[in-house]
């Protein structure tokens, strides 16, 4: 497959993803001008969409050893954008903090960030796979412990200490 074909395919994927944005951006109810939490969800969502486009476009401009980490960055920001659009809708509909959805987002994106960290580290120097697994297991323990503490499964302090 030629480089031009790959660039065209990436551009088509980005265009297709961005064409879905109006549907994701359409809240069931309208944000009120003084709803700063809802507005912050909206701003974060849009920033994440812009970051996604940036990371995917930049994969065509960097050396090969950086392409995978930029692609993972784009995936992280895309997944987070979708979750933040959804969290905004939950906030507007209920007026409550969407804690469970925030942790679902983190359970997906934080491990991806650890993968990205490992990829960047590996691009710079020789590292063992053991580092990757220690960081990944620590990440999962931190997230599950934090969630358990936040929702009261093991008390706030128990979750704080574990997380």
Where are each of the predicted segments found?
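N-terminal secretory/membrane targeting signals
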Residues: 1-27
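Membrane-interfacial loop-to-transmembrane alpha-helix junctions, especially the N-terminal start
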Residues: 8-13, 63-74, 126-135
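Hydrophobic transmembrane alpha-helical segments in integral membrane proteins
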Residues: 25-48
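Short, hydrophobic transmembrane alpha-helix segments
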Residues: 26-34, 54-64
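Internal transmembrane alpha-helix with an interfacial aromatic "cap," most often the third helix
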Residues: 53-56, 87-88, 94, 103-134, ...
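A generic, lipid-embedded transmembrane alpha helix
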Residues: 71-90
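Non-cytosolic membrane-interface motifs at loop->transmembrane helix junctions
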Residues: 93-104, 155-163
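Alpha-helical membrane segments in multi-pass integral membrane proteins
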Residues: 133-145, 156-163
């Amino acid at each position: 497959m030629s480089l031009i074909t790959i660039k065209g395919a990436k551009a088509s994927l980005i265009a297709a993803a961005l064409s879905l944005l109006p549907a994701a951006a359409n809240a069931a109810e309208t944000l009120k001008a003084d709803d700063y939490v809802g507005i912050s969800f909206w701003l974060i969502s849009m920033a994440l969409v812009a970051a996604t486009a940036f990371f995917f476009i930049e994969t065509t401009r960097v050396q090969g050893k950086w392409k995978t980490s930029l692609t993972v960055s784009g995936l992280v920001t895309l997944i987070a954008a979708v979750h933040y659009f959804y969290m905004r809708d939950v906030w507007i509909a209920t007026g409550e903090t969407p804690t469970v959805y925030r942790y679902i987002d983190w359970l997906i994106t934080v491990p991806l960030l650890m993968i990205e960290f490992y990829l960047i580290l590996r691009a710079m120097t020789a590292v063992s796979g053991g580092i990757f697994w220690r960081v990944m297991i620590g990440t999962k323990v931190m997230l599950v412990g934090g969630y358990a503490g936040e929702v009261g499964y093991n008390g706030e302090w128990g979750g704080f200490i574990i997380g």
